[in-house]
A protein has these predicted regions:
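Acidic, Ala/Val/Gly-enriched low-complexity intrinsically disordered segments
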Residues: 4-7
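Catalytic cores of nucleotide-sugar-dependent glycosyltransferases that transfer UDP/GDP/TDP-activated
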Residues: 21-201
Length: 201
């Protein structure tokens, strides 16, 4: 028997109700920035509709019991500075465009969380600045879980940038990135693009 309520919030197998759908929303923040606030509101909308929704974040600003902070503050800071430091060094010690790009070379482990293991659906939102590495995204995709990714910018399909600003290099393989101090055909954006192709394959 299928209970009353939004069918999308229940798992149905062979016509029988099995359980509430468990959704884990992944975001760098819960209440900082438009993407995070949208993800947080979605979690509550899903819960109101009958889903068992929760959220995993790098930086937790709310006291919401359904939001779990992943990693210690010290380790999360280390992931953040490792990524920004790599970009800073690659960009010839220039702070210009430092936050216009992300390389996702460092991040927390989501796949080891009990909330991840229990979830039916993993819903990615904005997951940069030391939240998820490309290696961890690859683990998420290989986990067998159903994955939804809401794109709040273009980073998921460009080499490294969050906003292409008219550049269309991502339609081929990036390279010669206008955000880099020393762009070249096989620069950081090109390598990021190739890494994402491997990650998503």
């Amino acid at each position: 028997m299928i209970p009353e309520g939004p069918a999308s919030c229940f798992i149905i197998q062979n016509g029988y109700f099995c359980s509430k759908m468990r959704v884990l929303i992944i975001s760098t923040y819960d209440l900082q920035g438009g993407a995070a606030i949208a993800a947080y509101r979605l979690m509550h909308a899903l819960r109101k509709a009958g889903c068992d929704a929760s959220m995993a974040v790098r930086t937790r600003l709310s006291d919401d019991p359904k939001v779990v902070q992943v990693g210690s503050e010290a380790m999360n800071r280390l992931h953040f500075y490792r990524e920004r430091g790599s970009i800073f060094l690659h960009n010839r010690l220039s702070r210009e465009n430092l936050f216009d790009v992300s390389i996702a070379n460092s991040g927390v482990s989501i796949t080891s969380l009990p909330e991840f293991k229990a979830a039916d659906v993993i819903h990615l939102h904005w997951i940069n600045q030391g939240m998820l590495s490309l290696t961890e995204i690859e683990r998420i995709l290989a986990s067998g879980k159903k994955v939804v990714w809401t794109l709040h910018d273009v980073w998921a399909f460009t080499g490294i940038c969050h906003h292409a600003a008219g550049c269309r290099h991502y339609e081929q393989a990036c390279g010669n990135c206008p955000y880099l101090a020393a762009p070249s055909p096989r620069d950081l954006s090109y390598r990021g693009f190739l890494k994402k192709q491997i990650t998503y394959a």
